[in-house]
Amino acid sequence: MLSPKRTRFRKHHRGRMKGISYRGNSICFGRYAIQALEPAWITSRQIEAGRRAMTRNARRGGKIWVRIFPDKPVTLRPTETRMGSGKGSPEYWVAVVKPGRILYEMSGVAENIARKAISIAASKMPIRTQFITSG
């Protein structure tokens, strides 16, 4: 699963996801892509599940690019812990995704195979997505 090798700070603020994505919203590498339509935190497990689903469906041939990276740590407190005594320890990593962001790209396969693979990957995501092709 994806996670940063090292970070400047161990814990982050939660932040808020307002507006649309101005970066990473156009197809750069492949021919087909999956684009987010809603804001969400996507965990490294979800990213990996989507990537595996795509590679399994586009068997032999085809190249896949993952365009998001989980660089935000999410902290959790131990269960049944009283309030206070600081922030919890980092448990998992998420990628902050805004509407319009490209999640995965794909090329080297027929469009119907790409559609099928991307729809299966989309079912692993916690948000609504759309299939797009490069002009």
Swiss-Prot record:
One of its GO terms (molecular function) is rRNA binding. It comes from the Eukaryota. The keyword Mitochondrion does not apply. GO terms for biological process: translation. SUPFAM superfamilies: Ribosomal protein L16p/L10e. Keywords: Chloroplast, Plastid, Ribonucleoprotein, Ribosomal protein. The keyword Transcription regulation does not apply. InterPro entries: Ribosomal_uL16, Ribosomal_uL16_bact-type, Ribosomal_uL16_CS, Ribosomal_uL16_dom, Ribosomal_uL16_sf. One of its GO terms (cellular component) is ribonucleoprotein complex. It is found in: Plastid, Chloroplast. Part of the 50S ribosomal subunit. Belongs to the universal ribosomal protein uL16 family. This is Large ribosomal subunit protein uL16c. It comes from Cucumis sativus. The gene is rpl16.
